[in-house]
């Protein structure tokens, strides 16, 4: 328990330190909201992906893999395709257009591009973004509480307050720069952890044959790429649904401005 608390304290200290140093780089509203649009390649990449994945990937998809087996990989394929399309065909073009209007947010761009003279377009677009972002952030807050509960045995709501409080502190102090730099730090940890976990599991379980035979004993359907029951209409519809997760990544506001 002492080691866990030490690691957690070190982790939070790094996040608060990032917020402090980011605050020293903020000199105008563009710096605060979009980092002056001058993030480096790796920071932008890891920030976007750690925002897009985070608890959804580390907790949600891994749990889904445990329940569905090999067929859960369809959601990974859909995500990779969606992310690739958004970066390859949409993000660069959209950023060029927002730079032309000197837009900081997507509502700013829409108002400038369509020459809106009222606040209706801004209100509608901001409301839509706020609604879906709040839903997504709520899921991350829920994951934070559950992680503290299982990791340290803390009360669920105490974990939410602690984790969310740290996030609010470094966001208020350093704005988007603090978010991007902290995402880079946390994304690097996620990347290394996801690379090491299967390697450690492979050698701990004594090879791939043991994994396959173990899954087969639990449920042969876990090894079927179409899911339990094979290629049926229901499973085909499920696969199409899992692949369609990539559509959501084409509308990620943090990627485009």
List the predicted regions and their residue ranges.
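Helix-loop junctions at the membrane interface of multi-pass solute transporters
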Residues: 31-36, 49, 63-64, 91-99, ...
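Hydrophobic, small-residue-rich membrane helices and short re-entrant helix-turn-helix hairpins
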Residues: 102-107, 111-116, 175-185, 251-257
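Membrane-interface "cap" regions at the ends of multi-pass membrane proteins
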Residues: 1-59, 171-174, 196-199
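Transmembrane helix-loop boundary segments of multi-pass membrane transporters
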Residues: 2-4, 62-76, 141-157, 177-186
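Helix-loop-helix module between adjacent transmembrane segments
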Residues: 74-171, 240-248
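Loop-to-helix junctions at membrane interfaces in multi-pass transport proteins
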Residues: 34-39, 43, 60-77, 111, ...
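Extracellular loop-to-transmembrane helix junctions
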Residues: 2-23, 35, 39, 64-104, ...
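Hydrophobic alpha-helical segments and their helix-loop junctions in multi-pass secondary transporters
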Residues: 18, 22-25, 87, 91, ...
């Amino acid at each position: 328990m002492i080691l866990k608390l030490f690691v957690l304290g070190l982790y939070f200290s790094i996040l608060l330190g990032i917020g402090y140093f980011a605050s020293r780089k903020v000199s105008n509203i563009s710096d605060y909201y979009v980092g002056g649009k001058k993030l480096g390649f790796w920071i932008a990449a890891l920030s976007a992906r750690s925002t897009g994945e985070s608890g959804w990937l580390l907790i949600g998809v891994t749990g889904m893999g445990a329940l569905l087996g090999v067929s859960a990989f369809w959601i990974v394929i859909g995500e990779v395709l969606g992310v690739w399309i958004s970066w390859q065909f949409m993000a660069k073009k959209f950023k060029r257009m927002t730079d032309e209007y000197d837009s900081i947010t997507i509502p700013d761009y829409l108002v400038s591009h369509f020459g809106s003279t009222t606040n209706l377009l801004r209100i509608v677009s901001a409301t839509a973004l706020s609604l879906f972002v709040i839903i997504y952030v709520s899921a991350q807050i829920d994951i934070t509480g559950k992680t503290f509960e299982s990791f340290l045995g803390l009360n669920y709501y105490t974990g939410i307050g602690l984790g969310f409080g740290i996030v609010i502190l470094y966001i208020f102090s350093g704005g988007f720069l603090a978010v991007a730099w902290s995402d880079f730090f946390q994304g690097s940890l996620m990347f290394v952890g996801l690379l090491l976990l299967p390697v450690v599991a492979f050698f701990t379980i004594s090879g791939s044959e043991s994994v396959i035979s173990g899954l087969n004993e639990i449920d042969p359907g876990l090894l079927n790429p179409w899911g339990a029951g094979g290629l049926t209409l229901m499973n085909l519809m499920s696969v199409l649904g899992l692949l369609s997760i990539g559509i959501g990544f084409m509308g990620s506001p943090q990627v485009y401005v």
